[in-house]
Amino acid sequence: MAWVLSMDEVIESGLVHDFDSSLSGIGQELGAGAYSMSDVLALPIFKQEDSSLSLEDEAKHPPFQYVMCAATSPAVKLHDETLTYLNQGQSYEIRMLDNRKMGDMPELSGKLVKSIIRVVFHDRRLQYTEHQQLEGWKWNRPGDRLLDLDIPMSVGIIDTRTNPSQLNAVEFLWDPAKRTSAFIQVHCISTEFTPRKHGGEKGVPFRIQVDTFKQNENGEYTDHLHSASCQIKVFKPKGADRKQKNDREKMEKRTAHEKEKYQPSYDTTILTEMRLEPIIEDAVEHEQKKSSKRTLPADYGDSLAKRGSCSPWPDTPTAYVNNSPSPAPTFTSSQPSTCSVPDSNSSSPNHQGDGAAQASGEQIQPSATTQETQQWLLKNRFSSYTRLFSNFSGADLLKLTKEDLVQICGAADGIRLYNSLKSRSVRPRLTIYVCQEQPSSTALQGQPQAAGSGGESGGGTPSVYHAIYLEEMVASEVARKLASVFNIPFHQINQVYRQGPTGIHILVSDQMVQNFQDETCFLFSTVKAENNDGIHIILK
């Protein structure tokens, strides 16, 4: 036994000696100074890489930083964007911090900057339909705003403004050299934009976005400096506290290995800076939004689902100018249509332009190309949906059901688009049937020619009646429709009379039109006015 052990020791020592000998010569052929790490790092390729990295680090240094005093959720995975829960209507502080290095942006020294804080949608699909979503919210909650600024609690902000047409944005001026805090209140909750199906649906995430601008040569705050945003969800009062507590309890039940996959909860939320790049828009939408600045983050490809993106900021020169209402439609002799062409940006479901578009017979055909479909959407005041339907032909659009359109466009515009596609006209308030007698040169004081009996005129020719549909029960509407149907110059019509008992002429007033019976038949004749300036119309 002892002999066997001694043999093992001899063999082992021999193997170790051979192994050491085989390694002892490695690298000696190259020489001691042949491989120097300092020489390798001094190569030009590494010098260029170091310089590019330093430039990139310098470019990434943001001029400002915004910190919201609200805790982040502990139930967020490591490589995902932070998520913060907010209570509806509660004031939350956003600290506006100057993050510039010494000598950076000297043009801002002693100057004010303008920041616009907005609550926008996180999901890209909802961002494209933001206008329709917010209009629906406004319809359900008239007089309310999605975002407010708690001015008494805010510090260092100047010239605060809100625009009645932009319920999700507030703006103010501030001095980067001074302490500044803006307290915001979010009044919309995440579940308000979730389709109601069976209850218990998860609310959609929002983003709190801050865009900062400096003055241009004209003194207007239009030069963009910085944008940052964070992801939030808004709950009913105290709902955010309960959600935060539930997430914390769930994390406590996880194992230590599982906890390593999640971020810790931080007391504050840092708004993440986004590098912005413009989207190249098609020609149709470019005409519709010449001044829009829709943007995407530079790392759009892989991280869009995780990090979201900054939403396009509103046009600062005109965003807070009160636009005067458009003038009422006017009618002239050169305008044979029954009403004026509506503004393409109007989205009111009760706009008078619906009747005009359908009365003219301009409806989309199944053979319409994608470009013709885009033009039809613009003409019928669906310009907000040109991007959504950019690849739709006429046949594709006509195949959509009413439920499909409501889901895509929302209830109001979805029903309006469905009715436009099906060419459904608005039911008139009053319908009258009118037949024209041969023009008479008889003066107003003379008696007009009596109508023939049995539905025929005095010459024995069968009388052909035209239907007149009145959307407005006023005398001017009667004159306007008669001029349009019978090709009478509207500016030549002085008065409209109705022949009463014993042949007297009664002036047609708004009150008389309102007392017309539906589907009343009239014969009418035209007579020259007393001064031969224009004509009068007499209904019989």
Curated annotation (Swiss-Prot):
Domain Grh/CP2 DB residues, every copy: 60-296
Main location group: nucleus
One term of GO molecular function: RNA polymerase II cis-regulatory region sequence-specific DNA binding
Ranges for region Disordered: 235-265, 285-372
Polar residues bias: start-end ranges: 319-351, 360-372
CDD domains assigned: SAM_LBP1
Subcellular location: Nucleus
GO cellular component, one term: nucleoplasm
Database matches in SUPFAM superfamilies: SAM/Pointed domain
Residue span of region Erythroid-specific transcriptional activation: 274-309
Keyword terms: DNA-binding, Nucleus, Phosphoprotein, Transcription, Transcription regulation
Alphabetical GO biological process terms: angiogenesis; negative regulation of viral transcription
Keyword presence, Transcription: yes
Tissue spec: Ubiquitous. Highly expressed in erythroid cells.
Family: Belongs to the grh/CP2 family. CP2 subfamily.
Descriptive protein name: Upstream-binding protein 1
Organism of derivation: Mus musculus (Mouse)
